[in-house]
Amino acid sequence: MVEAVSVVACLILATVLIYVSQSPFYQTSSTSVDVIIPPGAGVNASLGFEPSTVKVVIGVNNTVIWMNEDSDWHDVHSDTGVFYSGMIQPGSSWTYTFTSSGTYPYHCDPHPWMTGTVIVDSV
């Protein structure tokens, strides 16, 4: 009888743990936002940073990762000089964590049609 109770208790515990681990309430949100530099962005003026505008919240998801999926080198240069990535080689990425709220327009120096904006809110 004790073995049967132990088995039932283990099954109940396993069911609860599976439910909790898959519940959105208990999942942590991402602390970063991805911006893609797509293939062809260096030669095709209709392509650029994807998405071109991102919104982040300080202390929640205030890190932006720019990923260069193009075969050309790119940079991420704040229009106001707040941040600058240097050249990002193909297949690499650059990360910046925003600590002040505001609107941050940026561009790619070698490819002036590539522009974007990061909007940073505080909690």
Positions of PLM-derived features:
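Extracytoplasmic copper-binding redox domains, predominantly the cupredoxin/blue-copper superfamily
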Residues: 1-123
